[in-house]
Amino acid sequence: MAAKGLFNKVKNLPTRRRFVVSTIRKDENRFETAVFEANFFYLPRRWSKPDFMVETRTRDEAWDMHFHLTARLTQEYPAQVFKEYP
């Protein structure tokens, strides 16, 4: 069975806010990485409205984007990270 998605819990060190980073396959050649602000138990506050979302075309790009966002959200201010992507 092929992997269908990734899921990471992230605690932002500068702001102490919690986020959930999720990458899922939407179509055969379309992946979506979404960042949700989370509560203390790492449950997203708004399931239908992610705070940030990026679409990629290949699985490798999606996985790289997922791990890149996870690493940056741990160390940098979220607004700064979200501003850098269209």
Description of each model-found segment:
Residues 1-35, 39-40:
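Short N-terminal "domain-start" leader segments
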Residues 1, 79-86:
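Short intrinsically disordered terminal tails
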Residues 11, 31-33, 37, 51-59, ...:
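Histidine-/acidic-rich catalytic cores in large beta-rich domains
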